[in-house]
Amino acid sequence: MGAYKYIEELWKKKQSDVMRFLQRVRCWEFRQLPGIVRVTRPSRPDKARRLGYKAKQGYVVYRVRVRRGGRKRPVPKGIVYGKPKNQGITQLKFQRSLRSVAEERAGRKLGGLRVLNSYWINQDSTYKYYEIILVDQAHSAIRKDPRINWICNAVHKHRELRGLTSAGKKYRGLRGRGHLYHKARPSKRATWKRNNTLSLRRYR
């Protein structure tokens, strides 16, 4: 087995003594640092490479901290108008994953870079930590590489804000295939619109 295979097996057994100790020490360190911080190299090189990372110019990795828990409805003093059914405030669940939120925060802060992918690295009772792989679309090494220069096209600006990354496609329900998923495409909203639009076709 190569080195990456050993690293992969280590990460598969997160409850082992080695990983528990490592993760506790790292988590303590992450808590002391800012919410978005650049890292020199990926914490999980095997995972990062599977998701498209290359150790060359133009690729950047940032660690993002996201607070865990549900989403509270942002209303002043808990005043929600309407029926009692819709007056919930605290026990609501955000429709997007925390990973997609981490990608969004990194993408907003680093507007000149393109978000390629992301992966989980750590968590404690309060936070989850993700590493985000970003690509500098203006770098000549990226623009010349046929495997990655697709991301230089203008259509890929802020793909993380439009649900086009892997995490984004997951929360949009686009991972599955077959007849069971026909209501998820092209999007939930488009399907709703198609089903709720009265179409009176001319008889020919």
Swiss-Prot record:
One GO term in the molecular function aspect is: structural constituent of ribosome
Protein family per UniProt: Belongs to the eukaryotic ribosomal protein eL15 family.
Keywords (A to Z) from UniProt: Ribonucleoprotein, Ribosomal protein
Matching entries from Gene3D superfamilies are given as: Ribosomal protein l15e
Q: Name one Pfam family in it.
A: Ribosomal_L15e
Q: Does the keyword Ribosomal protein apply?
A: yes
The protein's gene is named: SB61
* This protein's name: Large ribosomal subunit protein eL15z
A GO BP entry: cytoplasmic translation
SMART domains in UniProt: Ribosomal_L15e (SM01384)
Give the taxonomic lineage as stored in the record: Eukaryota, Viridiplantae, Streptophyta, Embryophyta, Tracheophyta
